[in-house]
């Protein structure tokens, strides 16, 4: 699913970047500009194929979530890190997807999700917990996150 998400993300960035006036391009985040420029070279056939995979994945997630109240997972794959890098510099994976490996599949499948704090690392960095539910169950996700926060201040 990483490649499917990357195609959607990069093509979407290219579309957004195309609307940025030339005199404002220098104000854009360099990482966004790089992603948008890479996205501009994605063939339409690759985007259509990615859309078909996205639809199939969304249907599979709906089938799974018809049997479950929620999927609960970490919010991110790694602890918080200093900004501005998208991920720590020692990470060899695609820097735009590495830290969001639990979130991007849910964005791709279009299920509602909510991340809530659930603790701290040994270094005092925040850890998040992600609640995911079936499409249309936005209020259910928000309620679960609220209930968790109340029970775990």
Residue ranges and their predicted role:
Residues 1-7:
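Acidic helix-start/capping segments at beta-turn-to-alpha-helix junctions
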Residues 5, 49, 80-100:
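Short, surface-exposed loop/helix-turn segments at secondary-structure junctions
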Residues 7-62, 112-125:
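Short helix-loop capping/hinge segments that flank enzyme active sites or metal/cofactor-binding pockets
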Residues 12-28, 100-101, 137-150:
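Short, basic, helix/turn surface patches
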Residues 42, 48, 59, 67, ...:
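Structural helix-boundary/capping segments
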Residues 76:
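Short glycine-/small-residue-rich Rossmann-like dinucleotide-binding loops
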Residues 93-116:
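Small-aliphatic-rich amphipathic alpha-helix that forms the alpha element of a beta-alpha
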């Amino acid at each position: 699913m990483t490649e499917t998400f990357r195609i959607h993300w990069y093509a979407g960035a290219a579309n957004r970047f195309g609307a940025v006036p030339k005199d404002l391009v220098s104000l854009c985040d360099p990482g966004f500009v790089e992603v948008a420029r890479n996205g501009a070279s994605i063939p339409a056939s690759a985007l259509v194929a990615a859309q078909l995979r996205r639809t199939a994945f969304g249907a599979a997630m709906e089938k799974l979530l018809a049997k479950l109240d929620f999927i609960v997972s970490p919010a991110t794959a790694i602890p918080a890190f200093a900004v501005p890098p998208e991920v720590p510099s020692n990470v060899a994976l695609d820097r735009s997807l590495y830290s969001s490996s639990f979130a991007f599949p849910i964005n791709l499948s279009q299920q509602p999700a909510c991340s809530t704090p659930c603790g701290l690392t040994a270094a005092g960095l925040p850890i998040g917990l992600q609640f995911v539910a079936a499409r249309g169950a936005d209020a259910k996700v928000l309620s679960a996150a609220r209930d968790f926060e109340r029970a775990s201040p």
